[in-house]
Amino acid sequence: MRTTPMANASTIERKWLVVDAAGKTLGRLSTEVASILRGKHKPTYTPHVDTGDHVIIINAEKIELTGKKLTDKIYYRHTQHPGGLKSRTALEMRTNYPEKMLELAIKGMLPKGSLGRQMFKKLNVYRGSEHPHEAQKPEVYELRG
């Protein structure tokens, strides 16, 4: 009897991919990177196994937002103290914390739970065009569209 082959930790081939964020739209870049982290671009995709590749995003400070989102979109965080709700606009986030801006967008598109946290660990975001992962011999990945 034939059975459908299921991926497991020992059969997964992981690659390192470099994505250049310069001039790309935040949401469109994030959806594609989240899909790569999940492994949905592979024929061996299995929902309950982390089959995704490692992704390195460079030039995070050059990410684009459409419309008036730079001034109107607000990122909230809480200090866990009474009255500790803090807010920043997308422009402040892109200027001071562009890595965090991309990480938050991608993390929201991954599964919630231990598997999603494991997938998120394979994401590396850097502000400039340099990254410390040359030893892994990453391949340049061109986004669709």
From Swiss-Prot:
Disulfide bond positions: none
CDD domains tied to this protein: Ribosomal_L13
Biological process annotations from GO: negative regulation of translation; translation
Pfam families from the UniProt entry: Ribosomal_L13
Organism taxonomic ancestry: Bacteria, Bacillati, Bacillota, Bacilli, Bacillales
Gene Ontology MF, one: mRNA binding
Domain of life: Bacteria
Keyword line: Ribonucleoprotein, Ribosomal protein
InterPro entries given in the database record: Ribosomal_uL13, Ribosomal_uL13_bac-type, Ribosomal_uL13_CS, Ribosomal_uL13_sf
Protein function: This protein is one of the early assembly proteins of the 50S ribosomal subunit, although it is not seen to bind rRNA by itself. It is important during the early stages of 50S assembly.
Quaternary structure and interacting proteins, as annotated: Part of the 50S ribosomal subunit.
SUPFAM superfamilies in the record: Ribosomal protein L13
UniProt similarity note: Belongs to the universal ribosomal protein uL13 family.
GO annotation, cellular component aspect: cytosolic large ribosomal subunit
Cleaved signal peptide residues: none
Gene3D superfamilies per the UniProt record, alphabetical: Ribosomal protein L13 (3.90.1180.10)
The species this protein was found in: Bacillus velezensis (strain DSM 23117 / BGSC 10A6 / LMG 26770 / FZB42)
Full protein name: Large ribosomal subunit protein uL13
